Swiss-Prot record:
Any one of the GO CC terms: bacterial nucleoid
Subunit text: Homodimer.
NCBIfam families named in the record: DNA_YbaB_EbfC
DNA damage among keywords: no
Signal peptide: none
Alphabetical keyword list: Cytoplasm, DNA-binding
Gene3D superfamilies per the UniProt record, alphabetical: Nucleoid-associated protein YbaB-like domain (3.30.1310.10)
One Pfam family per UniProt: YbaB_DNA_bd
UniProt name for this protein: Nucleoid-associated protein ETA_24730
Function: Binds to DNA and alters its conformation. May be involved in regulation of gene expression, nucleoid organization and DNA protection.
Entry's localization field: Cytoplasm, Nucleoid
InterPro entries, per the entry: YbaB-like_sf, YbaB/EbfC
One Gene Ontology MF term: DNA binding
Length: 109
């Protein structure tokens, strides 16, 4: 199916892809994004592992309804989670750039 040169080239591409994947995974782990809700009144910052790093609440909200504040914190976290997922997907897609993958092949992420 593959000649020696073709198989060697395929193995080289696989090794390069593995190295790039490891690098991208490190970059993802170090990423931080901030999600917002309530027009920026609540901000939640998470890292690439979806661990919460910071929660910022505008002081004006501390006088309001507790349930509303809880909803805003949850919405800000969900916004941050969506943003980090999109950033991770974009980073991981860069791993396959330049690789000659079969048509229709999808990366497992």
């Amino acid at each position: 199916m593959f000649g020696k040169a073709g198989l060697g080239n395929l193995m080289k591409q696989a090794q390069q892809m593995q190295e790039k994947m490891a690098q991208v995974q490190e970059e993802i782990a170090e990423m931080e994004v901030t999600g917002e809700s309530g027009a920026g009144l609540v901000k939640v910052t998470i890292n690439g592992a979806h661990s919460c790093r910071r929660v910022e609440v505008d002081p004006s909200l501390l006088e309001d309804d507790k349930d509303m504040l809880e909803d805003l914190v949850a919405a800000a976290f969900n916004d941050a989670a969506r943003r980090i997922s999109e950033a991770q997907k974009d980073k991981m897609a860069s791993v396959s750039n330049g690789m000659s993958l079969p048509p229709g092949f999808k990366m497992p992420f």
